[in-house]
């Protein structure tokens, strides 16, 4: 059996997108991993499954699977690719759509210039909702933000914790490019204080409206861009009094613009979405790959 797929990226964060409306799909984690494998599959940071929603107040549902096969709550770059996918395939003619994801409802708008704006919802800071178990960790307050300290590779990492539908721990570094993200990232990601693991962000402040960011994503490793990570970093910087909205976030994959009006307000993310190529998966071969 053959299954059509579309390869896309949002600022270098790449996805395999599957139309679960045309063909119902129920893959195992092993099969998702096989598709995401860059040697034996198509290759992707994450995979997006487009489905119809059973809710009358939304247009679509989509599910997000990490490179390791695990399903996750939200993905900002994936949301932008999702909008382009359903628009290009003629599944909707709306400029603004409402979609259901694991953690709630998102509103997505295709701009006239092809950029996509995503209403990412209001950030959450309560530790229990990330979840985050700080116990007796050292703390400090900067502006409206409370940070907690972890000892990572002999360095003190002061972390701002925020959920953008998925958990993030953000620290400010002097030089994002030189920082050992691939060494410290996995230690933060899997630290015991984060029971469901965490996305680790490393933010360099350029000026009050611009940062450089690298993110070690939960279940995916370092990626070229992370939309929810960009939102979390901008929010953390604004709460700490280091940044003002809007914030230009420069990643290895490109730039995103993040706007946030403050406590209780939604975070608005604007950025590109690009189709790279289309193809077909051989499901029989995929099952064999997944079995090994």
From Swiss-Prot:
Homodimer. Its EC number is 5.1.1.7. Catalyzes the stereoinversion of LL-2,6-diaminopimelate (L,L-DAP) to meso-diaminopimelate (meso-DAP), a precursor of L-lysine and an essential component of the bacterial peptidoglycan. It is found in: Cytoplasm. Keywords: Amino-acid biosynthesis, Cytoplasm, Isomerase, Lysine biosynthesis. Pathway: Amino-acid biosynthesis; L-lysine biosynthesis via DAP pathway; DL-2,6-diaminopimelate from LL-2,6-diaminopimelate: step 1/1. The active site is at residues 75, 226. The record marks 168, 217 as: Could be important to modulate the pK values of the two catalytic cysteine residues. Belongs to the diaminopimelate epimerase family. GO terms for molecular function: diaminopimelate epimerase activity. PROSITE patterns: DAP_EPIMERASE. Gene3D superfamilies: Diaminopimelate Epimerase, Chain A, domain 1. GO terms for biological process: lysine biosynthetic process via diaminopimelate. The keyword Cytoplasm applies. The gene is dapF. This is Diaminopimelate epimerase.
């Amino acid at each position: 059996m053959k299954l059509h797929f579309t390869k896309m990226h949002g600022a270098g964060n790449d996805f395999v997108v599957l139309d679960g409306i045309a063909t119902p799909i129920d893959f195992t984690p092993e099969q998702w991993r096989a598709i995401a494998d860059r040697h034996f599959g198509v290759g992707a940071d994450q995979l997006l499954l487009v489905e119809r929603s059973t809710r009358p107040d939304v247009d679509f549902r989509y599910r997000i699977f990490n490179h390791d096969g695990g399903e996750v709550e939200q993905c900002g770059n994936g949301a932008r690719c999702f909008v382009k996918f359903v628009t290009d395939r003629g599944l909707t003619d709306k400029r603004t759509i409402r979609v259901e994801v694991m953690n709630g409802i998102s509103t997505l708008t295709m701009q006239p210039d092809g950029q996509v704006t995503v209403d990412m919802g209001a950030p959450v800071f309560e530790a229990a909702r990330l979840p985050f178990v700080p116990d007796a960790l050292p703390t400090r307050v900067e502006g409206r933000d409370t940070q907690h300290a972890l000892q990572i590779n002999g360095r003190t990492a002061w972390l701002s914790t925020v959920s953008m539908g998925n958990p993030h721990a953000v620290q400010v570094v002097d030089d994002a490019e030189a920082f050992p993200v691939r060494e410290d990232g996995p230690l933060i990601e899997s630290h015991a204080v984060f029971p469901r693991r965490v996305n680790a962000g490393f933010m360099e402040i350029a000026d009050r409206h611009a940062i450089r960011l690298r993110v070690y994503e939960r279940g995916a490793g370092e990626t070229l861009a992370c939309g929810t990570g960009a939102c979390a970093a901008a929010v953390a910087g604004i709460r700490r009094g280091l940044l003002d909205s809007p914030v230009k976030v420069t990643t290895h994959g490109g730039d995103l613009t993040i706007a946030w009006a403050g406590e209780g307000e939604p975070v608005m993310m604007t950025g590109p979405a690009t189709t790279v190529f289309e193809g077909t998966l051989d499901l029989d071969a995929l099952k064999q790959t997944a079995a090994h």
